[in-house]
């Protein structure tokens, strides 16, 4: 043995017979910390300090430890002799248990160097038949034995096959290798979660082999070699199904559970839910071990286990017997948890990605693949109508502990493990309104050509709604508010609490509203409780469902209103059809003067004289002067004096120019003055003359005067 072998540490080799005996029957030590697990092919447990477990050879343990220390000192003093006769001397002198070796290591200088695994010579080969058969089956496999010496806290994996914590759960058996290499100085990427640990690795009959650091800190490979008469039997196909994920990744995941170390070893349900516990290999515990006797995995419900032969390549029928452990196959839910941290104490299934805990996942590790049967099951559940209906009625905060294999199971689980929310009506289809004719945005936008007439006038809107049912409406561009809209609505009857305003035609039960447009959206003017809507279609859609500030809900028309042609909203057609019954222009409103019982041209002349004789002339206001067969409507463009005033045709007496041809010259060019005489709204026995001046030469007042005169003549004839 070369002297370079002893530069950074000590190499101790055991006889093949003795190592095989100790590997199969290790003896626990009372000198190790409280949470130092040991394992054999028959049992699994921990050694608490207050209750140490002694074996038959415990009486000679002190003598063996002293002999081991003396021999180790001899090896340190005589490195040359050890190199020359290492094989013969070690085989004949060293005879002590694994626990005595651990005690000796704790007392020695803890500065060990990582030695290449290929230094082990042929003398490291085991001679027993079990190891020989394993060597033939897996010539390239490397056995790892991981024993924690001083552990400060628990760091456990949630993966069913990997663990880097002091509570190592070996899937099937203890290592069966010859050479033992002791080291502490392990590369950072391959170091386990605890800084002070011992790693025992063996090389099966290879003179030199490349170092495989990924296996040192991540996993203990599953081996199929078992002693005859062992109470645990490895199912066929299990080894190959589990080796790939064990050796393929170096990423270790920290446990999010706040419980102690021993809870993970004994399978406490405070650290892992039943679905996660069922995913661990059952043969790592025996019925006679302390772990299984104390917790027994909390008696998982056997009837609720979802057994699939394609999930973990195990027989579909679990072995349920008193002499053999129950084989609990991993469920699809548990497989999905293998890529994230264990669920919390509340059994919440919200996964925490590995990248949030340990950084980036290993790029070489393949993503978890679902079996074809599980994919079909997921697809069938997702497309099941009953499953979709059940999901919309309740919101589950915690998934059930039993795997769900059918929509009926899902129904039962959601009823017993969820907080039910009130039933919410389903949204109607966007193509057409629902059964109760509740419209949708698409339906409102598709029918906008029937209810949105931007070019029609107020009188045209009234004519369209005159013969329609209550709730019918039409929206047009406002002539007084630029950018706003006018809403004309047919109501059943005028509410008693809402008095008639000027401009409302009470005889036809048609009311008019202004829909303002601003940066916030469209809003019904004068209704503070009304929200702002992003578009006119949204305004109509909401008010067709709820009336809000309107007298009634809007009824969206599905045909042309009033039996008109589809092109009735064109400007040319509208002007032609209403040319004889309406006229309008912008004028300057001056003032209103009471003329007592006068009427005709004399009333206009007297009113102008009274106005001009005042010390302070009135301030003019631009208004829209509209004449229809129903009367005269004045709309203040700037809303300075009034909003809108309506004078019915039956209240009009006269309309004409100033007989003296006087002109108005304040704040504008000289313009002609005219006015109309109507019945006073405050004094029923008197008349009032309302004076105006032409605002624009392109809009002369002669047109509106002629129309009012013609309408008055028609009224006198009747």
Swiss-Prot record:
It comes from Rattus norvegicus (Rat). Residues 188-244, 272-437 are annotated as: Disordered. Residues 192-207, 306-316, 337-349, 367-393, 405-415 have a biased composition (Polar residues). SMART domains: PTB, SH2. Pfam families: PTB, SH2. The modification Phosphoserine is found at residue 230. CDD domains: PTB_tensin. The lineage of its organism: Eukaryota, Metazoa, Chordata, Craniata, Vertebrata. The keyword Ion transport does not apply. One of its GO terms (molecular function) is actin binding. GO terms for cellular component: cytoskeleton; cytosol; focal adhesion. Residues 585-711 form the PTB domain. Residues 451-558 form the SH2 domain. One of its GO terms (biological process) is protein localization. This is Tensin-4.
């Amino acid at each position: 043995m070369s002297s370079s072998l002893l530069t950074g540490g000590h190499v101790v080799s055991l006889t093949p017979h003795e190592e095989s005996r100790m590997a199969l029957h290790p003896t626990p030590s009372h000198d190790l910390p409280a949470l130092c697990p040991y394992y054999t092919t028959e049992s699994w447990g921990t050694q608490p300090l207050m209750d140490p477990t002694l074996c038959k050879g415990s009486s000679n343990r002190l003598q063996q430890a002293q002999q081991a220390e003396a021999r180790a000192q001899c090896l340190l003093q005589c490195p040359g002799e050890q190199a020359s006769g290492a094989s013969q001397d070690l085989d004949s002198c060293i005879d002590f248990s694994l626990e005595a070796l651990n005690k000796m290591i704790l007392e020695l200088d803890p500065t060990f160097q990582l030695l290449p695994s290929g230094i082990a010579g042929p003398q490291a080969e085991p001679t027993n038949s079990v190891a020989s058969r394993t060597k033939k089956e897996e010539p390239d496999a490397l056995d790892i034995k991981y024993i924690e010496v001083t552990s400060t806290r628990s760091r456990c994996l949630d993966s069913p096959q990997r663990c880097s914590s002091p509570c190592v759960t070996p899937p099937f058996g203890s290592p069966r290798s010859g050479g033992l290499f002791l080291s502490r100085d392990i590369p950072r990427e391959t170091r386990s979660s605890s800084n002070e640990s011992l790693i025992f690795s063996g090389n099966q009959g290879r003179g030199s082999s490349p170092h495989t650091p990924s296996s040192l800190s991540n996993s203990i490979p599953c081996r199929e070699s078992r002693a005859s008469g062992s109470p645990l039997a490895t199912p066929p196909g299990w080894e190959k199904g589990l080796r790939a994920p064990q050796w393929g990744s170096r990423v270790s995941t920290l446990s999010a559970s706040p419980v102690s170390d021993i809870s993970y070893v004994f399978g406490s349900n405070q650290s892992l839910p039943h679905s996660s516990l069922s995913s661990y290999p059952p043969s790592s515990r025996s019925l006679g071990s302390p772990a299984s006797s104390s917790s027994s995995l909390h008696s998982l419900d056997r009837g609720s286990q979802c057994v699939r032969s394609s999930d973990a390549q195990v027989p579909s029928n679990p072995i349920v017997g008193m002499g053999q452990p129950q084989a609990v196959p991993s469920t699809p839910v548990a497989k999905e948890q293998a890529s994230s941290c264990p669920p919390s104490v509340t059994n919440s299934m919200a996964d925490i990605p590995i990248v949030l805990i340990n950084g980036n996942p290993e790029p070489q590790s393949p993503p978890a693949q679902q079996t074809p049967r599980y994919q079909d099951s997921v697809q069938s559940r997702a497309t099941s109508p009953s499953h979709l209906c059940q999901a919309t009625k309740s919101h589950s905060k915690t998934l059930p502990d039993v795997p769900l294999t059918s929509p009926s199971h899902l129904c039962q689980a959601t009823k017993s493990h969820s907080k039910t929310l009130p039933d919410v009506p389903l949204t109607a289809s966007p193509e057409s309104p629902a059964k109760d004719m509740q419209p949708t945005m698409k339906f409102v936008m598709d029918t906008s050509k029937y209810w949105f007439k931007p070019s029609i006038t107020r009188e045209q809107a009234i004519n369209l709604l005159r013969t329609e049912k209550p709730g019918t409406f039409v929206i047009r561009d406002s002539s007084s508010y630029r950018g706003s809209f006018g809403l004309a609505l047919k109501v059943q009857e005028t509410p008693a609490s809402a008095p008639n305003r000027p401009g409302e035609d009470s005889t036809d039960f048609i009311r008019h509203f202004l829909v303002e447009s601003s940066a916030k959206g469209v809003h019904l003017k004068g209704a503070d409780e009304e929200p702002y809507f992003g578009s006119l279609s949204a305004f109509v859609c909401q008010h067709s469902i709820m009336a809000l500030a309107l007298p009634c809900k809007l009824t969206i028309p599905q045909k042309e209103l009033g039996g008109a042609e589809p092109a009735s909203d064109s400007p040319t057609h509208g002007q032609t059809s209403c040319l004889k019954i309406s006229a309008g222009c912008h004028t300057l409103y001056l003032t209103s003067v009471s003329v007592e019982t006068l009427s005709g041209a004399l009333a206009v002349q007297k009113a102008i004289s009274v106005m001009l004789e005042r010390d302070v002339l009135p301030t003019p206001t631009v208004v829209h002067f509209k004449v229809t067969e129903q009367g005269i409507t004045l709309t203040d463009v700037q809303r300075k004096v009034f909003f809108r005033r309506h004078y019915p045709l039956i209240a009009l007496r006269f309309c004409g120019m100033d007989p003296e041809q006087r002109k108005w010259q304040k704040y504008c060019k000289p313009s002609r003055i005219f006015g109309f005489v109507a019945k006073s709204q405050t004094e029923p026995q008197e008349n009032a003359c309302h004076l105006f001046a032409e605002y624009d030469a392109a809009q002369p007042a002669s047109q509106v005067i002629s129309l009012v005169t013609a309408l008055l003549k028609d009224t006198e004839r009747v």
